[in-house]
Amino acid sequence: MAANVVIRPVGRDERAAWEPLWNGYLAFYEATLAPGASDVAWERFHDSGEPMFLLGAYVDGRLTGIVQYLFHRSSWTPGNYCYLQDLFVAEGVGSLTLA
């Protein structure tokens, strides 16, 4: 059975849903951040002047995956590159069968 998946920006009011996924990502990589780094990242995701972005995968309305990405200049091309920085899904979500 296919799940109802929607991809959209994670709203500023959804930090409580984002944090467990973000913390799961950091735990998977055994990463420790500088104090306040998550707060700064969260603000950047929601600042239209910043080149950092956050999308969420919502399964039946529940945030179950995140991708954090940014655009940056390159010396190889006149255009920008999109750098996928962080990608994480909740346990069990990766095994969903999508039709």
Name each model feature, range by range.
Residues 9-79, 85:
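Acetyl-CoA-dependent GNAT
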Residues 4-5:
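Extreme N-terminal starter segment of soluble prokaryotic enzymes
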Residues 76-77, 90-99:
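Conserved glycine-rich acetyl-CoA-binding loop
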